[in-house]
Amino acid sequence: MQIVILKDSASVAEYGANIFIKQLQKKADSVLGLATGSTPLSLYQGLIAANKDKQISFKAVTTFNLDEYLGLEGTHPQSYRYFMNEQLFDHIDIDKSKTFVPPGDAENPIAACQGYEDKIKSAGGIDIQLLGIGRNGHIGFNEPSSGLMSRTRVKTLTKATIDDNARFFKEGEYQPHLSITMGIGTILDAKKVVLLATGENKAEAILATVEGALTAACPASALQLHQDAVLVIDEAAASKLTDRDFYKHIEVENQKLMARLGL
């Protein structure tokens, strides 16, 4: 697991965006795993700018989002399909028929979950998966106690996640308590995983992810098993790591090696 500790959220977004830009420059028909929430927004702005500047193109790209609220149509302002259109897809040269979000309005959610897995497989698997992390260590909507080898499925949201997301819904508006989410096993199948985290409120979750035990109590700890997982975090999110100075030293040496190898 590569730990990159940067000074602030803007630096985190820029570093994360550059990972995706390099991926698209290397492989124009990349399959990207995408995430929603506040953390990726600045990263998406970086990708939009790079697309407008002709540094990258999304014309051959396929995308799969991590999750979606069950019970919301894609036109609902709080659906993740709506979010992705508003924050990224409407601003880049992507073929929307190749952008996939779990169907929150599926008549048969169980069948839809298997169908989502099949689509990922048919696309050749995910080249690079973007993640955020919840205060309780959830990734996607894989809440604590989720199986570490789980696949795309229907999940019940915890009260903590419901409370965290309540700010996005108007008072009295229906807020779903169920979701469709890629499983932890699905996420681990990605060739590369990039997790972004900023703010002191994520410090406990980052501590558990990096220095804690591999456990279903912290779903993100499963990234310890991945051969190419990169955690890009700011100083606040890293504040409880006991070995953060060592992680910074490792990254400096890693960058020297990459420069020497021309990578």
Curated annotation (Swiss-Prot):
PANTHER family, A to Z: GLUCOSAMINE-6-PHOSPHATE ISOMERASE (PTHR11280:SF5)
Pfam families linked to this entry: Glucosamine_iso
EC nos: 3.5.99.6
Residue numbers annotated as active site: D67, N136, H138, E143
UniProt key word 4Fe-4S: no
The species this protein was found in: Shewanella halifaxensis (strain HAW-EB4)
Stated role: Catalyzes the reversible isomerization-deamination of glucosamine 6-phosphate (GlcN6P) to form fructose 6-phosphate (Fru6P) and ammonium ion.
UniProt protein name: Glucosamine-6-phosphate deaminase
Known partners and oligomeric status: Homohexamer.
GO molecular function: glucosamine-6-phosphate deaminase activity; identical protein binding
Annotated catalysed reactions: alpha-D-glucosamine 6-phosphate + H2O = beta-D-fructose 6-phosphate + NH4(+)
Principal EC category: hydrolase
Keyword terms, alphabetized: Carbohydrate metabolism, Hydrolase
